[in-house]
Each structure stands twice: as C-alpha cells, then as structure tokens.
Regions:
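Conserved small/polar residues in nucleotide/adenosyl-binding loops
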Residues: 2-10, 185-192
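Short linear capping/connector segments at secondary-structure termini
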Residues: 8-14, 53, 112-118, 174
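Aromatic- and glycine-enriched pocket-lining scaffold segments that form the walls
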Residues: 109-170
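Structural helix-adjacent loops and short alpha-helical linkers that scaffold large soluble proteins
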Residues: 36-50, 80-93, 139-152
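Internal amphipathic alpha-helical repeat/solenoid segments
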Residues: 5-26, 36, 48, 56-61
Length: 196
C-alpha cells in the first residue's frame, strides 16, 4: 500500500479496505495496534503501530472537520502513553490547536462539518464528544486552560441539547449562530436513521 493508506474496515467480501489518512476512522487501526502491543509487548506489533501512526501525522493540521481529535488521540495518544515518544506529544498538541479552531464561543461547541451549509448552519454531531479527551489531555500537558475550557463547554452544551427525555441522542444538532445565545428554539434536529 502507499504510505498514506490506512485500514478503515472490512468490506462485504471480507477483504480489508483502505483509505487515505484524512478518512475519519484512520486513527482507529493504529490505535488497535497500540493496544495489541500493550498486551503482549511484541516488537513487530510496535513496529506496525509506529508505521500506521506515522501515516496520519499530517492530520495534526486538519481544521476542516472535527475528526482530528479521535484520529490522533486513538493513534498518537496510545503511542505516547506506551512509548513516551516526545514527537507524539507534539503531534497531539498541534492537533488540539487545530481542533480548537472549530470552536465558536457563541455556540459553545466544536463545529463538526463545513459541508451541506444549506441544511445545517453550525452542525454538531454526537461523535464530537470523542474529541474531548484529547483536549483535556492537551490542556494538562501544555498548561493552556483554553483546551479544557473548550472541552467543558462542548460537553455542557451537548448534554443540554443532544439528548431526548428517554436519553437517546440526536446524531446532528444544527445551532443558530446569528440570533444570539443558543436556545431550544434555535435548534434543528436532523432526524435520520443515524439518530442513536
């Protein structure tokens, strides 16, 4: 495979499918390799984990979607935890900086996507919660409270708006960014089969 290819999932025919590093699940496969290495300390697994982790390093500069948090924290986060490689720390700190550019204080959340703006003004999906661990880590490891403040704000707003009375969640909430503070009257729930 090319250097930028990562495994994304198993296809219907049972064969592994690959994707480019920008694909939203690109950090999961290297993250799993790090977990396998943690369990059995097999150096060949460590080598594969390092290789597949390196393939997504440029995503630390991603600012056009929210996926950067879980792409990097699953891979580089586990790599750092198991090896103390300072290069991994720098990747994570840059990734947190990139992710934080998607936060809008007026909304209190990290914007998920930039596409389909005719439907969603400021879409936030429930998956975005997976990014908060990296932001909390970055705040602690950089002494920059900004990252923790973003994570806490995002969690608070998500808890307030994303969940129904029966505790199921909407997949997408679109927030109004123009008419002032967000309230329930400014929310549009994207009703699809993707709702949890």
């Amino acid at each position: 495979r090319g250097l930028g290819d990562v495994y994304k999932r198993q296809g219907k025919d049972g064969k592994l499918m690959t994707s480019k590093a920008k694909w939203w699940t690109s950090g999961f496969f290297p993250g799993v390799l790090w977990y396998l290495y943690e369990v059995n300390q097999d150096d060949s697994l460590k080598m594969y984990a390092e290789n597949y982790t390196k393939r997504i390093e440029n995503e630390k500069y991603t600012t056009d979607n929210h996926d950067v948090g879980f792409m990097l924290y699953c891979s580089f986060g586990n790599g750092l935890r198991l090896t103390s490689n300072d290069e991994y720390k720098q990747v994570l700190l840059q990734g947190a900086e990139s992710l934080s550019t998607r936060f809008r204080p007026q909304v209190g959340c990290i914007r998920s996507w930039d596409w389909n703006q005719k439907v969603w003004e400021y879409p936030v999906i429930i998956d975005n919660m997976m990014n908060l661990e990296m932001l909390m880590w970055a705040s602690k490891n950089s002494d920059n409270p900004k990252f923790a403040e973003i994570a806490k704000s995002h969690a608070d707003v998500t808890m307030k708006h994303h969940f129904r009375p029966d505790y199921s969640s909407y997949h997408v909430i679109s927030y109004d960014t123009i008419s002032g503070p967000v309230s329930y009257t400014h929310l549009r729930a994207h009703e699809t089969l993707m709702n949890l």
